[in-house]
Amino acid sequence: MNWTILNVSIPVYDLQKSKQFYDMLIGYNENQKLLYQSLYKNEESIFFGNKGFGLRLFKPIPDLSISNHIQSRRSYITLLVDNLENIKEKLELKDIKFIYKKSDNELFKSLYVQEPSLNLIHLVENTSGFEDHLNGWSMGLDWGIHHMNLESLNVRESIHFFCNLLGMKEGQWVAPINKGDFSIDPSELAILPLSNNNRGLHVIKPDDGFGYRNNFAHNPSIAGHPAFTIKNLSNLMAKLDEEKILYSDAKVYAMPGFHQIYLYDNNANMLEINQEV
C-alpha cells in the first residue's frame, strides 16, 4: 500500500489562543490553498500548512451530541492512502467497526477506525489518484510532520493491525550511538516507516519511568504525540524560555541526527519539536 501523512488533528479548548501558540512554534501560513480542508467542513478547525496537509486544530463538541461520527480527545493522525476499498473489505471480514464516508463531490473517500489500543486512525483516499509530491512532511514550508507517536498497551497487536489490515510495512528502529534509556525491543517500540530516518508512525508501550530515567520533565511514551521538524530549534527554545514555557531538551537521544525537545501546548497536549542536525 502507498501511504503518507496527510495531517495531524489536535483537540483544543480555545481555537484562537491555540492558533497563537502554534504560530509561535511553527508559523501560520496565510496563503493556504484549499483541497483536503473540506473533509472537516462540519467541525470548527484552524489549519496550519497547505491544502489541508500539516496540522489541524479542532474544537471538540459534546460526545452525546454526535451521531455517525467519532472524535478523539487525543491528537490523532490522518493518512492518505491509495486503496481504501481494499482496507474496508478487510475490516468487514474481521467485523471491525468503522465509519465510512464519501465527500459531496465524490473526490474523497474517508474512513475512521480505531486500532486495537483504541487510537483513532483516519484514512483518506483521493479518487483522482495517489500523489506524494505534497504531503505532511513536505509542504514547501519551513516545517513538516516527522512522525506521529501512538501509545499502545500491546505493540505487536497494533502493528499486526497496521500491517495485515491496512497493508503497511514494519521497519526497524534506527537508534543513535548515544541512545537514551529506553527500549527498542519491537514488543515495546515499533515503527512503520516512510523513510530511513524514523519518519512515519511510531508505536510505543507506555513506560512510566521513561521521563525519570532520561531526566525529562515530560514522558513522551504516554498518551501519544505528533512530532514536527523545524529549521531553527535553538531559536524556538529561546522563545520558550522567554515565555517561561517548560520543555525537556532531549538533545540527540532517540533518532540519529535529530535534536528533540518535548513540551505541552496550552491545552496540555504533548508535542515533540525536532531539528535535523
Predicted ranges, named:
Residues R156, C163-Y253:
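Structured core of small recognition/catalytic domains
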